[in-house]
Amino acid sequence: MSKILIAFASMSGNTEEIAELIKTSIEPLGHEIEMKEIENINTQKLLEYDGIILGAYTWGDGELPYEVEDFYDDIETLDLTGKKVAVFGSGDHAYPKFCAAVDILEERLMACGAEIVEQGLKVELAPETEEDIERCITFAFNFAGRLEGAAL
């Protein structure tokens, strides 16, 4: 099975809640999963994973949160060619750029050669509705399936 990293930044707990939901959805499939806060990631270690799932909330008017900035800068020099990745995030529609951190991270990962295998998951605040929970589970299953080469 594949080695997967789920790295996230969460201020209010919403993004961490999504990360936990993704992790518990993938775990029964037999993958080796490591979950860490993004600010504790040595970016060189990303090369050791078969799949990478990143999560971040959006700060202010569509910016990356402070704890993601160093990570974002550090991955610019990495060659992530062949790495299968996906990005998720929490946001608030009260702000003009809903979940912009998801798009910012996807763009950087693609610029580094990574393959986005599942469209970014954007959740309003926390996954509290049945629909949001189902979207998180589907995101997780699709990522795991595409990591193994077959979309679910």
What name fits each language-model region?
Residues 1-2, 152:
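Short, Lys/Arg-enriched, disordered terminal segments
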Residues 2-3, 116:
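Secondary-structure boundary/capping motif
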Residues 4-5, 34-38:
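Contiguous segments within soluble domain cores/interaction surfaces
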Residues 4-25:
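N-terminal beta1-alpha1 ligand-phosphate binding loop
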Residues 8, 12, 39, 57-58, ...:
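Short loop or secondary-structure boundary microenvironments that flank
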Residues 17, 25-29, 34, 48-152:
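FMN-binding flavodoxin-like domain, especially the glycine-rich phosphate-binding loop
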Residues 40-45:
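Short acidic active-site motifs
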